[in-house]
Structure formats: structure tokens, C-alpha cells
């Protein structure tokens, strides 16, 4: 037991004398109420993301010029990976461009993102963590 006591003493786990404190019922209630106020909700801690991790990643903006409707899935995949996308539709026929925008609008809606028209054939699609501020007006509107 001597070796065990020395090891416990080295680790700071040696037997210590405990002093009992007497508290009143009111003090115990105050402690319980204050401890309930200090405890955060469990659901809040589940969504914690280290700030430094986001800072190192940065935001990558993707530029796309689809030529076919099938390219819309690649654009949607970028949005799913939380990357904002600028889509230039000037190389696509008008009916195909409308289908692509319809597809991307559904994707953006499902991801709680945003889509805005910034030119005649240019759209910006963003996931939920990117905000678009301001508007671009055309020369004809002025």
C-alpha cells in the first residue's frame, strides 16, 4: 500500500480531509436556480462550428457557362457543397436556359439559398450561408 499511496500523492489524488458545510434550504434553492440559468440548451451546442475552421476554408465562388441542360446538375452539386455560383447562360438556347433556371431555383429553394438575376443572361445562386445585398438595375429601367 505504501507504493500506492506514493503514486496517489504524486498524482494529487491522496486522501484529503473533507469539511462539511451546512447550508440552509434557501441557499440550496438559489444554487439550483442559478445552475439552471447557466446551463445552455443541448440543441444549441450541437450546431457549434469552430470559427477558425470556417476562416481557413474561405469562400470559393464558382463561375459556370452551361452549354446543355445536363450541366445544371453540376451547378446544383456546387450549391450542395455550399459554394456560391455565378451562371452565365448566353451560350444556351432560350428554352434550355429557362429549364436550367427552373432546376436551379428548385435547388436553391431546397437549400434555403437565394438566386438573383444580375444581367440579361447572368444569375447568382447562393447557399444559405451567403447573403446577396443590393440590386443591379438595367440601363433601360433608368
From Swiss-Prot:
Q: Which residues form the signal peptide?
A: none
User: Composition bias, kind Acidic residues: at what positions?
Assistant: 21-31
Q: What is its main location?
A: cytoplasm
State the InterPro entries in the record. Answer: Cell_div_SepF, Cell_div_SepF/SepF-rel, SepF-like_sf
Keywords attached to this entry: Cell cycle, Cell division, Cytoplasm, Septation
Q: Which GO terms describe its biological process?
A: division septum assembly; FtsZ-dependent cytokinesis
Region (Disordered), start-end ranges: 21-46
Q: Where in the cell is it found?
A: Cytoplasm
GO CC annotation terms, alphabetical: cytoplasm
Keyword Cell cycle listed? The answer is yes
**Entry keyword annotation includes Lipid metabolism:** no
Q: What does this protein do?
A: Cell division protein that is part of the divisome complex and is recruited early to the Z-ring. Probably stimulates Z-ring formation, perhaps through the cross-linking of FtsZ protofilaments. Its function overlaps with FtsA.
Quaternary structure note: Homodimer. Interacts with FtsZ.
Q: Which family would the database say this protein is a member of?
A: Belongs to the SepF family.
- Under what name is this protein listed? Cell division protein SepF
Q: Which organism is it from?
A: Brevibacillus brevis (strain 47 / JCM 6285 / NBRC 100599)
Instruction: Identify the coding gene.
Output: sepF
